[in-house]
């Protein structure tokens, strides 16, 4: 991983961890009916997608090893620019299932890389 990507991977990992905390112990129906919670989850997806987009631009080799990077960036773009067409059930599914593996990958990148000075 390139040194300049470290901060972006860190930001992405923090967003993933927030997503996991926000959705832990919450049902899909509770999520869908709670505007504050759904807004918080969507915000973390915006951060996650933007951080991964920066990794993709600055460090394509690392980006190639991030599962579903293009889908995550795409979700970020939909949330940010097509907010009226966001499907809460898809966001819920991504937040509760797909980010688990991503946390492992991002943690591994940070463990393998030395933090830049």
Regions inferred by a protein language model and the residue ranges of each:
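Solvent-exposed interaction patches of small proteins and small membrane subunits
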Residues: 1-117
